[in-house]
Design a protein with these regions (language model features):
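N-terminal helix-loop segment corresponding to the beta1-alpha1 unit
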Residues: 1-123
Length: 123
């Protein structure tokens, strides 16, 4: 579920792309869990080799996409983007008001990649 998007974005980084990881304020990134847990010096996400490996060299922002302010910030980021990779279940982006039609109206040449861990069908 949370594997495909981060890894696809990491491949893009490795090939020279500038990537901004958009994190949710509601849900912790599945990669944040550390095999070692929190330490005295570091929280789990700082100590997690998995989180650090898949997010190396990415920019990062935390947004509340259920809020209109967070949605507007993402739209602003999209206006300067070439590719958007999302790893949500079906219909989540549309529920946020961030479906492909909306985002392509902002940036017509935007390439949207949807990597749902649950498929794209409706049944």
């Amino acid at each position: 579920m949370f594997f495909a998007g981060p890894v696809a974005a990491q491949i893009a980084v490795d090939m020279g792309a500038d990537v901004i990881k958009v994190e949710s304020v509601q849900r912790i990134d599945g990669w944040c869990g550390s095999a070692f847990g929190d330490t005295e010096e570091l929280p789990a996400w700082e100590a997690s080799p998995f989180f650090n490996r898949v997010n190396r060299n990415k920019g990062d922002i935390t947004l509340n996409l259920t809020d209109s302010w967070g949605q507007e910030i993402l739209k602003h980021l999209v206006s300067d983007a070439d590719v958007l990779i999302e790893n949500f279940t079906l219909r989540v982006m549309a529920n946020f008001g961030l479906d492909s039609e909306t985002l392509k109206a902002i940036k017509p040449r935007l390439v949207m990649i949807s990597l749902s861990g649950f498929g794209m069908g409706t049944s």
